[in-house]
Every structure is written in structure tokens, then in C-alpha cells.
Amino acid sequence: MLGNFRFDDMVEKLSRRVAGQTSRRSVIGKLGTAMLGIGLVPLLPVDRRGRVSRANAADAPAGTDPRAKWVPQDNDIQACDYWRHCSIDGNICDCSGGSLTNCPPGTKLATASWVASCYNPTDGQSYLIAYRDCCGYNVSGRCPCLNTEGELPVYRPEFANDIIWCFGAEDDAMTYHCTISPIVGKAS
């Protein structure tokens, strides 16, 4: 009990000293500065080089860019190196009963999307792909891909593939299942 009184006395002396040496305006000013600083934190750039390096560590030779190994193909749509999957981060819906443009039965399409420009090696053109999440069931676990071509940091959410976009799906289907990759048009 005696220790509590010493602690109380110490806190009281400290608070009285702070109150005697500072004004309300300075406290409010410092509080406002801190709140502004906290609000600006999401605008700071995000470095993802370590994440890309870990994802490609087994395949990339030492001293090379891990993304340099990305060679798109136009044959197997369930493979991660299929040209439309250049910026997908999740599971390909074609492996779960869906297709490149349709969600599997029973899942709901999220209203929001993120976009990327992917190169088609067959016709030599780049296309704008609007990745959209299918929601409502647990993650399928089939055909997981982590491709980061053209991905931008999280503070540009329309180009970030790390966000689960299921918040806009109908019936409050908030559980991520897989991602579709329809073509929006040619990229110029």
C-alpha cells in the first residue's frame, strides 16, 4: 500500500509540473501535429522487393532481378505464367469451377476491381485486365499465384493486388475464394 502512495505522489508532481510549464494551446498544437502525421503515414511508399524476392527465391539466380524470369505464355490458362495473370495475387478461378471471366457457381462477384496491363505474346499486344475477386466460399487453394508485374504500392489501391476486394460483393459475401481476369480493352 505504501508503494501506491509514492507512485501517486510522483504522478501528481509530474502532472503539476507539466501543467505549470505548458499551455493548452501548445498541447492542442502538438496533438494536432501528431494527428496530421498519423494521417499522412498511408501516403508513404511501400517497398515490396523483399516479398518478391522470397516468392521467387527458388527460381531466380543470385544477382538478377526476380521479375526478369516472367515469360508469359498463351497455352495453359491454369498456369501462373499465363499472360492474363501477370498481376494476379490469389487463386485462379479456372481451377475452381469458374473461368477467366466468370466466378465459380455459388460465389459472388465483388463490385470493385484492380487493373493491370498484361502483354499477350501471341499477338504482341498489351491488354488492360480488370482483376475481380469471387467471394462467398473459403479459399480454394487450387492454382495459387503471386505475380507482381505492374503492381503499385497499397496507397494506389486500384493498382494493388494485395487487397481483398470482397467488401463490395452482394449478400455480404466477404470471404475470398478466387480471382477472375477479364480483358477490358487494349492498352495504348
Swiss-Prot record:
It is found in: Periplasm. Its cofactor is tryptophan tryptophylquinone residue. Pfam families: Me-amine-dh_L. Disulfide bonds join 80-145, 86-118, 93-178, 95-143, 103-134, 135-166. Residues 1-57 form the signal peptide. It comes from the Bacteria. One of its GO terms (molecular function) is methylamine dehydrogenase (amicyanin) activity. The keyword Manganese does not apply. This is Methylamine dehydrogenase light chain. It comes from Paracoccus denitrificans. Belongs to the aromatic amine dehydrogenase light chain family. NCBIfam families: TTQ_MADH_Lt.
